[in-house]
Amino acid sequence: MASPALISETEAWKDLKAHVEDIKRTHLRELMGDTERCQSMMVEFDNIFLDYSRQQASPDTINKLYKLADAAHLKQKIDRMYNGDHINSTENRSVLHVALRAPRNSAICSDGKNVVPDVWNVLDKIKDFSERVRNGSWVGATGKELKDVIAVGIGGSFLGPLFVHTALQTDPEASKNARGRELRFLANVDPIDAARNISGLDPETTLVVVVSKTFTTAETMLNARTLREWISSALGPSAVAKHMVAVSTNLPLVEKFGIDPNNAFAFWDWVGGRYSVCSAVGVLPLSLQYGFAVVEKFLQGAHNIDQHFSSAPFEKNIPVLLGLLSVWNVSFLGYPARAILPYSQALEKLAPHIQQVSMESNGKGVSIDGLPLPFESGEIDFGEPGTNGQHSFYQLIHQGRVIPCDFIGVVKSQQPVYLKGEVVNNHDELMSNFFAQPDALAYGKTPEQLKKENVSEHLIPHKTFTGNRPSVSILLPTLDAYRIGQLLAIYEHRVAVQGFIWGINSFDQWGVELGKSLATQVRKQLHASRVKGESVEGFNFSTKTLLTRYLEATSDVPAAPSTLLPKI
């Protein structure tokens, strides 16, 4: 008998659908009273502790989710990814970001070729180059050391490296290595972003890393040309070769741009942009800032979770459990969003990165075979570090819509502070909130409790908390380069699990193409209107009105301008 075309046609899916009513008749107050249940929903791996007991789920729910995983052939799909099969079927590509952090002696193949030696050739090249820049043997055009780096990229070429950079900034080892150096990221084509990035920097001491696989990404290349002009106008055109390097595979365009092809660092078609932080995309700028040894620990942490994900049984497998619970929350309980809430300011850029990893991967409306999905998939991801978020959007999380939450805590702070006479230290104050918030969401506060506290009758409806709001708690022992790599890989694989269950392609992103193609038409119109004075034609009434208004208000923009660089 042929397998069902959609996961929703399987008995395991239908069984979970029927099970929803059983769960809706329970409350987390009741579920949390079952100690045996709670113990069964706690998993530890390498001192990372996952507690998912505050999910709206019983042990029966979890067993049914395991059956759903079997029906979706989850283990086989994971194996196919690691084996280099072309699981990105719409682009006919392998998906092998796990190879980017594999040990040197590993064998991971794509199209019959072990790609790990190629990965390490690039890593060795990055190590050599970054060490030469950091020790002053590679200098700028005027002989000065290159202390400042601007990485130019967008999307996955920016969000992942920025997350890791921000997380490492306050790590004692990393911050010591970065002393006297600065790393910035230029992503947005908005000239304000360029202005902010070059503000306070000297072209003589600045190295620019241009990240574009094809060297044709419109926003990235315009920003790269802007920084090339910034360098050339100060130091002369010949300085570009000493002040700009590339992460790209298009060596002819790299050379045409003015960058020595020997200073181009490769990555491959089997690396998706949002999964590329462990490639030269992230490793090069991060190594320039923190040294290769620190970044290598980050890669080792990610590899540690890669091994765990591929080998651990589902009931002990952290990414699998998180992925299955997300499917349960989205497709069965009907919760469309997820809040990522790290109780560590160092993780302030985690949510924006995972927002892209998750929403670009799983924001699909059809199956991998092109069939419309008759169920909800994908999550709306957002988040802020605690306790900042508590004073922002937690109001809605507590008394508005039900939004499942990921609480991420760190046992030992990167930067401990102790003040004489305080009841608790700063980190304990932070963690007090980390431990309290999940219970507040789970238990809530009843009208009966409020009455016992003599709350005024007219305020009781306003002060009632319904509770029964699901969350998971992830406790990391520390937050160093190794643990940051682990955390990244947990979320990457969690997203893959969701896509494997839903039966979608989590590794393409056709949704970004339509807007880009329409922008090309607008770009041509703006050029024709500015240079030739042509009126706006070929657009709907709304767009024509807006474009015309924009052109009229910027009529002072010269048709053939001389170069003007941003100034702050």
UniProtKB/Swiss-Prot annotation:
CDD domains given in the database record: SIS_PGI_1, SIS_PGI_2
Compartment(s) of residence: Cytoplasm
GO molecular function terms attached to this record: carbohydrate derivative binding; glucose-6-phosphate isomerase activity; monosaccharide binding
Catalytic reaction annotation: alpha-D-glucose 6-phosphate = beta-D-fructose 6-phosphate
A GO cellular component entry from the record: cytosol
Matching PROSITE patterns: P_GLUCOSE_ISOMERASE_1, P_GLUCOSE_ISOMERASE_2, P_GLUCOSE_ISOMERASE_3
InterPro entries associated with the record: G6P_Isomerase, G6P_Isomerase_C, Phosphoglucose_isomerase_CS, SIS_dom_sf, SIS_PGI_1, SIS_PGI_2
Residues forming the catalytic site: E360 (proton donor), H391, K516
Gene Ontology biological process terms in this record: gluconeogenesis; glucose 6-phosphate metabolic process; glycolytic process
Signal peptide: none
UniProt-listed Pfam families: PGI (PF00342)
This protein's pathway: Carbohydrate degradation; glycolysis; D-glyceraldehyde 3-phosphate and glycerone phosphate from D-glucose: step 2/4
Keywords: Cytoplasm, Gluconeogenesis, Glycolysis, Isomerase
Coiled-coil regions listed in the entry: none
Quaternary assembly: Homodimer.
Similarity remark: Belongs to the GPI family.
Name of the protein in its database record: Glucose-6-phosphate isomerase, cytosolic
